[in-house]
């Protein structure tokens, strides 16, 4: 869409594409927004538009030149037109591209000028009245970027970005509940609310749902799932796995099937409108495909942006960085508060081709700081000491330079001749940035004491996992983790309160995801996606209750509706057993009478969903494990088993079991590959008091875990 800056003088010229995309121009100026190009091989990147003013096109070809981006424009009159291109030099030696207008290639090579976003002159070109083509041609495949093109008959360059804020609202969507952010927490919030019958608008700036768990970023979904909805929507593959695209498709199908959800993908929120009482009236967003502003109106809102943007625009209290040790009595906090956060990652991979593959980025090699690699894992992380929001683009670019440089160095070795760089996201996988404040600020002691909150709505078991850039002297993009995960004590299951998922000063705002109310250290455990997705489920259920009861988010707590909320969520909570398990008799690996032979190891499972706090894993020559089954009266029972979710469960993993009761011995297997943390029926058996279940690791295949079993009267 082409839009004149002076809307009072604008006249409608022509429809330029399907989807109601329009061209509007004046005699003196024509603006070509980046989102109006047919992108070819360029990627539209909106993740920094709140800082630099607009989305932009990125030639992210991993060293292979991308296909041209093109736009058709109507020139209102014949004459000489000056061409201005908004761009920046992101690094010396790469990121160059050319622009053609009306079939003429401009003499300027763009992307080699100033390091700041600016309007670079492409000179003047003679154009005839009518339709002409604007074309962007990538020169190297290394992240050249263009945030718009302006044709003008004036000698002065444009000012600022081609911002959506200059556009009028073209559409209004009305709902009961607006969720901004389509990662796992936001998607869970939307689906949970919709399934309770309220109208939901889900606003997501990418073409798919999942956020960090999507195939665009490829972070595995760690942490305790707890709720069936989280299990429906979570990722099912590990870091960097291309099969995460299957999970993208599953999420999109689940949301599309919910008739109460109006899903808007490729739509980036950029501001809010407020009521006189300070509550949010609407969220304004840019439809990136049709280049028009959409207003989303509702009574209730959920900030699931990760960066806390909705709360920030609405004036919600927030903080960013590390609190001082004295503020919350946190042993892992620094003596003095500072601006440090957890960093962001770009996990990247290469594959081995069947022929040599060229790759050379000598300009990036100094930025690798001596590191050579053909893959990058979670600890390729940067930004701990920088502003994760204001400097987001610089943080991402630093990680790109490290990746290209380390891979270029590795390619000099003969054994890597056939390696091809096949994945390096351009979207940052963030861990922490702005955190919105609620009535309870979740902190370290809530984890370590396992505080039994009466208003608990989520649980976690991932230890406090803090990252530091001290992996190797002189290398600033590799990190280590310290805290309570794999580095000291683990605390088992801990609880997160409802008071941490609504704003303390914006009365109609929930928050789900990493921007929930917590300290830096307090975020260290719950920050993994499955746990944060639980917050989304709770926010969605609470939003539906607000509409049903005429309450505000705070009112659900203040007016004693927490038990109702917990009942709708399901499961156990501190002091409240799970009513669905009233007739179950559970035996855990930590229960009295359970015996493990030699070779078994007790281990905390910080990815969650174990029955107790730990599970047992056998070595290669482990002896059997024996569970006495809690059978009080002879009869027909269903035997249930629960296997914690783990990346160790591969297809074909089978655990051989022997069930002994009343002199009979029955053998069966447990499919450990279906390790999703849910209770699964293993079969129905005639059982009598004294029955035992024996796990035989020596006869088993692949991954084996011993956790919890239950006997349930048949037919229940």
Task: List the predicted regions and their residue ranges.
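Bacterial N-terminal signal peptides
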Residues: 10-23
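Beta1/beta-strand and adjacent pyrophosphate-binding region of the FAD-binding site
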Residues: 172-183
């Amino acid at each position: 869409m082409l839009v004149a800056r002076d809307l009072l003088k604008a006249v409608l010229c022509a429809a330029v594409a399907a989807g109601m995309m329009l061209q509007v121009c004046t005699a003196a100026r024509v603006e070509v927004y980046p989102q109006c190009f047919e992108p070819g091989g360029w990627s539209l990147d909106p993740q920094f538009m709140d800082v630099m003013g607009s989305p932009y096109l990125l030639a992210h070809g991993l060293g292979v030149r991308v296909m041209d981006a093109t736009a058709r424009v109507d020139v209102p009159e014949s004459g000489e037109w000056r061409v201005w291109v908004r761009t920046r030099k992101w690094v010396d030696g790469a990121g160059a591209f050319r622009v053609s207008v009306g079939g003429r290639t401009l003499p300027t090579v763009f992307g080699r000028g100033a390091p700041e976003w600016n309007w670079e002159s492409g000179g003047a070109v003679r154009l005839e009245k009518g339709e002409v083509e604007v074309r962007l041609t990538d020169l190297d495949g290394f992240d050249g970027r263009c945030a718009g093109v302006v044709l003008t008959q004036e000698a002065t360059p444009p000012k600022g970005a081609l911002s959506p804020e200059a556009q009028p609202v073209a559409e209004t969507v009305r709902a009961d509940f607006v969720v901004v952010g389509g990662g796992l927490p936001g998607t869970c919030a939307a689906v949970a609310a919709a399934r309770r019958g309220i109208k939901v608008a889900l606003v997501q700036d990418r073409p798919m749902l999942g956020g960090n768990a999507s195939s665009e970023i490829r972070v595995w979904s760690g942490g305790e799932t707890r709720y069936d909805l989280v299990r429906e929507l979570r990722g099912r593959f590990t870091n960097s796995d291309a099969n995460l695209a299957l999970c993208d498709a599953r999420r999109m199908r689940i949301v599309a099937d919910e008739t109460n959800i109006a899903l808007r993908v490729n739509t980036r929120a950029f501001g809010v409108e407020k009521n006189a009482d300070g509550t949010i009236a609407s969220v304004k967003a840019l439809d990136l495909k049709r280049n028009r502003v959409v207003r989303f109106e509702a009574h209730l809102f959920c900030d699931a942006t990760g960066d806390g943007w909705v709360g920030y625009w609405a004036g919600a209290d927030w903080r960013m960085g590390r609190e001082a040790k004295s503020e919350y009595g946190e042993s892992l906090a620094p003596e003095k508060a500072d601006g440090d956060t957890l960093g962001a990652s770009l996990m990247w991979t290469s594959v081995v081709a069947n022929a040599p593959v060229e790759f050379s980025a000598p300009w990036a090699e100094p930025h690798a700081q001596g590191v050579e690699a053909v893959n990058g894992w979670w600890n390729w992380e940067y930004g701990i000491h920088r502003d994760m929001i204001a400097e987001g683009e610089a943080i991402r670019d630093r990680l790109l330079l490290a990746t290209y440089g380390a891979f270029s160095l590795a390619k000099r070795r003969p054994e890597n001749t056939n390696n091809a760089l096949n994945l390096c996201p351009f979207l940052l996988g963030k861990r922490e940035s702005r955190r919105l404040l609620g009535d309870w600020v979740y902190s370290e002691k809530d984890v370590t004491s396992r505080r039994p909150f009466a208003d608990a709505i989520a649980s976690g078991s991932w230890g406090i996992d803090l990252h530091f850039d001290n992996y190797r002297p002189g290398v600033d993009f590799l990190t280590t983790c310290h805290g309570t995960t794999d580095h000291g004590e683990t605390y088992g299951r801990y609880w997160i309160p409802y008071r941490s998922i609504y704003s303390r000063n914006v009365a109609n705002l929930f928050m789900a995801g990493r921007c929930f109310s917590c300290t830096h250290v307090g975020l260290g455990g719950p920050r993994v996606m499955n746990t944060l997705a639980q917050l989304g489920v709770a926010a969605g259920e609470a939003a539906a209750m607000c509409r049903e009861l005429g309450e505000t988010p705070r009112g659900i707590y203040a007016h004693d509706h927490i038990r109702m909320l917990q009942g709708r969520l399901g499961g156990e909570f501190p002091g409240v057993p799970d009513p669905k398990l009233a007739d179950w008799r559970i035996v855990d690996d930590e229960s009295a009478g359970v015996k493990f032979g030699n070779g078994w190891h007790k281990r905390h499972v910080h990815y969650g969903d174990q029955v107790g706090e730990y599970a047992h894993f056998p070595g290669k020559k482990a002896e059997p494990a024996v569970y006495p089954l809690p059978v009080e009266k002879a009869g027909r029972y269903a035997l249930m088993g629960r296997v914690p979710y783990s990346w160790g469960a591969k297809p074909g993993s089978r655990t051989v079991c022997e069930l002994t009761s009343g002199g009979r011995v029955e053998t069966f297997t447990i499919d450990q590959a279906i390790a999703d943390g849910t209770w699964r029926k293993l079969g129905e058996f005639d059982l009598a008091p004294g029955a035992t279940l024996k796990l035989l690791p020596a006869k088993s295949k692949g991954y084996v875990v011993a956790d919890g079993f239950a006997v349930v009267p048949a037919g229940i």
